[in-house]
Amino acid sequence: MTRLSSRRSLVAGALATALLGGLAAAAPSSAAEPTITNDCLLSVPEPGSQAPVKICYTLFQPAGASAERPVPVVMHGHGWGGSRTRTVSPDFKPLLDAGYGILSFDQRGFGESGGRAHTLQVDIEGHDVLRLVDLIAAQPWVRKEGGKDDPVLGAMGGSYGGGYQYLGAFADQLYNKRNRFDALAPEITWNDLKQALAPDEVARSTWLTLLTAVSTQDNDERAQRAFAYGAATGLWADGPAAQALDADMDAYFERTGPRWHVAQGRQLDIPTLVRQGTNDTLFNLNEAVRNFDSTLTPKARSRSMLIGYNGGHILPGLANSAVPRGASTNGDPCSAALGGGWEALRKAFFDRNLKKDDSVTIPGLGQYHLATTDAKRCVTLDSVAPTTTVALGTVATPVVAGAPLQLELGAGPMTVAGMPRVDALVTAAGAHAKAFFGLAVGTSPADATVVHNQLMPLHEEVPLVGSERSVELPGVAVDVPAGQKLFLTVTPFVDQFHGNGSRTPGALVLRDTKVQLPVVPTPVAVAPAR
């Protein structure tokens, strides 16, 4: 998926698989320059076709790498609508200089690769990634372990380029009963793509509008129709709408993320450096927490960490929402504190897990490290679960139009860091009743500002009375200073979900409302380096 902001964009089967001849172009190498090869291989056909699809790549062989001096390789994937990196970029240079090979590839449907994008279906794009792994393993200058077709292999990339990492690792386990990835470094990606794009069946219509616009020619036609429907209506394409569009999105997205693999009983025993944007309004922090908590085995989690930074997918013009008032800042104090910056931390993580360099020590493994909303400090946690309950009683909000409610939860100084939620008995008078919930900070309801610019919906498709509901709020890290207060924001409208208000007038009434807050009483110590 695409980060559409002013910052640098992330958008942007054995080797019997035939390589397409005549496309290789090796750059002259010197003592300090890598050898760069551009080529394509053939992968599985598109659904309904028998013609193989070409997947194109750029392979960087670092200076000095040879069969006598083999080196690890790091795969790189681009974001939605982007293409592979063909030159020595600032991201690549430190790794190449340190003796890592790199393979960057055009994901199916993008760049020079053929086919259409299927949002990383395991039975389509999963095979693309595995054939690239086979290609890497066939290079004589690549270090092997556990067999000649098992390269020492890492992976990096963000958004769609983070999704392929989980896809490839799980596909290797599913189809080959193997685990050839040795370290992953996914950024701003998803656990459950359907839940990310349409939490509680409420389509992120503003994002779907942009995602549709940047991929009209590249996307699977069914997904394209469903994205356009969600952008126009604010509803997820299921039921009768899915039949009319010939696009059952529940079934389509079922196998496109880690959640499905975990539900099938699979986990990854791979050290993983997870990085997610706390103010990412497409794939919020919750997606990364679910990946960290459920996708990794306990052993892998003890060798991994989650970094929450202030950044990610930011809507153009909506970095600070107007309705309700929201704010976000940029910064990554956790990567700075733990490794001297994200690129340096990632390289250290690869050095430790790919080069097996025991001299590299990394503090904070097995923990969550979250940037506060002002990006001034890093909160380290052993758990992101709620610790404190605040009872609010009855809360009533209109569902078509109305001013946001700001309900006081507590006074500063206090720190809230982790995964809050709202539990209540919900009554909805009309169909498709919706409201949006988040945390806010201010001196009063009049100036309360939504933390990390993040809200999540509650959507009742049919009228109901007194049904138990839990609303998962966006993951947060916020210091509430003395003189300010923490509020629960409840609003019938939010500009990030345009056109998503309820269709019929009425109200949502929440009784016995309890807000579960992850209050951090004292700073948690960073786990010792190891």
Model regions: which residues?
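N-terminal cap/lid segment of alpha/beta-hydrolase-fold proteins
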Residues: 32-69
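Short substrate-entry loop that stabilizes the transition state in hydrolases
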Residues: 65-71, 76-114, 281-284
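Accessory cap/linker subdomain of secreted extracellular hydrolases
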Residues: 97, 126, 138, 145-146, ...
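Glycine/threonine-rich phosphate-binding loop and adjacent beta-strand/alpha-helix elements that clamp
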Residues: 34-47, 355-530
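Short beta-strand/loop motif that positions the catalytic acidic residue
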Residues: 268, 274-276
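Secretory targeting and sorting signals
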Residues: 1-31
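Gly/Ser-rich "nucleophile elbow"/oxyanion-hole loop immediately N-terminal to the catalytic nucleophile
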Residues: 63-70, 118-124, 131-159, 175
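Short alpha-helix in the alpha/beta-hydrolase fold that links the catalytic acid
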Residues: 284-294
